[in-house]
Amino acid sequence: MTWLPLSHSYEHTVQFIQIIVGAKVFYAESLEKLISNMGVAKPTIMTAVPRFYQNLFTKINMNFEKQSGLKRKLINQTLNLGKKILKKEELKLSEKIINLLCEKLVRKKIRNQFGGNLQAFVSGGGALDQNIGEFLNAVGLPTLQG
């Protein structure tokens, strides 16, 4: 799935790779319709520049900040446990159980908003802020620096 113009140097390079490996390429109608287009295309990989992921980070955080009570605690646990897993830290039994809840109640819902099949976001054309990459991975959106 892509939304960058074909004239963009990163997108141009990625297009060649996609052609070489025989991948299907879906083009979003516009940046505003990207998420709804992802629901239709159900992409497995999406490439974009760091600015896209910064905006996504901001929007997800704005949504998280609106939550309160149990939802807010579950979101915080999702982030904390996701970061521990990313750093390959051992989870206690209680954390493993909570993480299962986070997977079903938070991460799965987030992944479904992006079509449900997303295997990886790939950021390229510049450096992705490490905190943004960690955050996206922690909430269930595997993000790689290309």
PLM features per residue range, with description:
Residues W3-H8, G125-A127:
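Conserved AMP-binding
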